[in-house]
Curated annotation (Swiss-Prot):
HAMAP family named among the record's database cross-references: CobS (MF_00719)
Protein topology in the membrane: Multi-pass membrane protein
Catalytic reaction list: alpha-ribazole + adenosylcob(III)inamide-GDP = adenosylcob(III)alamin + GMP + H(+); alpha-ribazole 5'-phosphate + adenosylcob(III)inamide-GDP = adenosylcob(III)alamin 5'-phosphate + GMP + H(+)
Principal subcellular localization: membrane
GO annotation (BP), single: cobalamin biosynthetic process
E.C. number(s) listed in UniProt: 2.7.8.26
Cell compartment(s), UniProt: Cell membrane
Enzyme class: transferase
Gene Ontology terms, MF aspect: adenosylcobinamide-GDP ribazoletransferase activity; cobalamin 5'-phosphate synthase activity
Naturally occurring in which organism (per UniProt): Brevibacillus brevis (strain 47 / JCM 6285 / NBRC 100599)
UniProt-recorded name of the protein: Adenosylcobinamide-GDP ribazoletransferase
Pathway of action: Cofactor biosynthesis; adenosylcobalamin biosynthesis; adenosylcobalamin from cob(II)yrinate a,c-diamide: step 7/7
Amino acid sequence: MNAFLHAISFFTRIPVPWLRPSEEAWRKSVNWYPAVGLVIGLLLWGVHQAGLVLFSPWIAAILTLIAWVYVTGGLHMDGWMDLADGLGSSRPREQILAIMKDSRVGAMGVLAAIMLLLIKAGAVAELAHPGWGSFLIVAPVAARTHVLLSIKLWPYLSADKGIGKGISSGLSVSSIIVSYIIVFAAGWYLGGLQVMTAIFLSLLFALWFSRSVAKKLGGLNGDCYGAVIESSEAVVLLVLVGSWWL
C-alpha cells in the first residue's frame, strides 16, 4: 500500500499526508501506475458528468481537460513537450538529449501540447453521450498500463539521471500481466468490442512509439514515458470516436 501511496503522491496532486517515504516503495510504485490511472479516470469522469449537467459538451470537455492537466500536475505533458522539442529539432542524438533537459519550452513543444489538447478535447466532446462515460476511466488506465511495457522492454538512457532512473528494477512481469488481464476484462465490461479495440490499438501504438523513440535516442527516460502516456490516452479517445460502427 505504501508503494501505491508513493505513486499517487508523485504522479498526482492528491495530498497523501500519511505517506511513509521509502526508496524501496518508490521503486515498487511503478507497479501501481494503472491504479493511479483509475483514480485519475474516476476524478475526470466526475468532472465531465458535472460539466454535462451544467454546460454544453464542448465546455464540459474543456473543463475535463483542465482537470486532467491539473490533477497530474502537467507532469506527463511536460515530458511530451520536451520530447517534441528534442525530436523536432532534427539534431544529432546528443543535442536532442540536451534540448530535452533544457527547462525552457520551445516552439515545437508548445505546438505539440496544443495539438494534443485539441485532439483530446475534441474527442471528449464527441463522446459526450449516454453510455460512453467509461472512456474517461479507460484512457488513463490503459495508457499507464502500456507504459509498463515501455519501461520493461527498452533500456533506460544510461546518461540520464532523471526521476525515472531505477524504477524498472521494481517492475515485475506478473504486475504487467495482471494489469493487462484486468484492463481488458474491465474494457469488455464497460464498452465491449469498441473499448477492447481502443485498448488494443493504443497498445500497438505505444509499442511502436516506444520502439521508434528508443531507436532514435538509444533508450527511454522519464520524458519519453510521459509522452507514451499522453499520446496513448489520445489514441484511446480517437479510436473510440472512430469505432462507432463496431
